[in-house]
Regions:
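Charged, often glycine-rich, active-site loop that binds/positions anionic groups
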Residues: 1-6
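Second-shell residues forming the walls of enzyme active-site clefts
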Residues: 8-170
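Mid-to-C-terminal alpha-helical segments outside catalytic/metal-binding sites
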Residues: 161-164, 170-193
Length: 194
C-alpha cells in the first residue's frame, strides 16, 4: 500500500524494511513493522480462507514472512491492522481475530514476538464496541500490547477492562503470561545487544 509503505513492490519493501531494521538494531531501538496482514484489501473478495491467505501470502504477507525470518527475533513488534477479512474471520477485525493473530501469524507463519494493535480507539469505533471490550478481545485473540491515544478516559477504561478480564478469567493466566513473556524477551534481547 503506497501511502503507508516504501513501495507497492513487496520485494523492494522488504529490502527497505530490513535496511531500516538493521539501523534500529544497531542503535538498540525497538521498532514495529506495520500492518499485518494488510492495510486494505481494496476490491478483492474471497470465497474461502485459503483463497484469502493465498492472495495475501503472495502480496502483503510475503513481506512479513521475509521480515520474520530475516530480522533478529525479539527486537521488533508486528502491528495488527483493523482490516476485516470475512473469508478468514467473518465476525472480527484482524486486530480482534484469533484466526488471524494466533492461528495464522503465530502458528502458520511462526512469529513468536510482540504483537501490538493499531490505535484501539479507531478499531473499537470500526467494530462498534467499547474500547475496553475491544482491547480485551484483542488480548484474548493474541495481541500482547495495545496502542492507545492520550485520552485519559480511554486509558482508565482499558485498565479497568483488562483488570476485570484477568480477574474473571476472560483473559487466562496462560494468555497473560504469554504476552508478558513476549514483551520481556524483547526487552532482554535489546539489553543483550548493548
Amino acid at each position: 500500500v503506497p501511502n503507508v509503505s516504501y513501495t507497492a513492490d513487496p520485494t523492494w519493501a522488504g529490502h527497505m524494511d530490513l535496511a531500516m531494521a538493521e539501523r534500529y538494531q544497531i542503535n538498540h531501538m525497538w521498532f514495529a513493522y506495520n500492518y499485518f496482514p494488510t492495510v486494505s484489501l481494496g476490491d478483492a473478495s474471497f470465497e474461502t480462507a485459503n483463497d484469502a491467505k493465498a492472495y495475501l501470502n503472495n502480496n502483503d504477507v510475503s513481506v512479513f514472512k521475509r521480515l520474520i525470518t530475516q530480522t533478529t527475533a525479539n527486537t521488533y513488534m508486528l502491528v495488527i491492522s483493523h482490516v476485516q477479512i470475512p473469508a478468514i474471520d467473518n465476525e472480527h477485525l484482524a486486530s480482534n481475530s484469533k484466526a488471524i493473530i494466533t492461528d495464522w501469524l503465530r502458528h502458520e507463519l511462526g512469529y513468536n514476538g510482540v504483537v501490538m494493535t493499531d490505535r484501539v480507539d479507531v478499531g473499537a469505533l470500526q467494530a462498534n464496541q467499547k474500547i475496553g471490550d475491544f482491547v480485551v478481545n484483542s488480548i484474548v485473540a493474541g495481541s500482547d500490547l495495545v496502542l492507545l491515544d492520550a485520552d485519559t478516559g480511554h486509558i482508565d477504561e482499558v485498565h479497568r477492562a483488562l483488570t476485570q478480564a484477568v480477574a474473571n478469567g476472560t483473559i487466562s493466566n496462560d494468555r497473560l503470561n504469554d504476552a508478558v513473556k513476549h514483551i520481556l524477551l524483547m526487552k532482554m534481547q535489546t539489553q543483550l545487544q548493548q
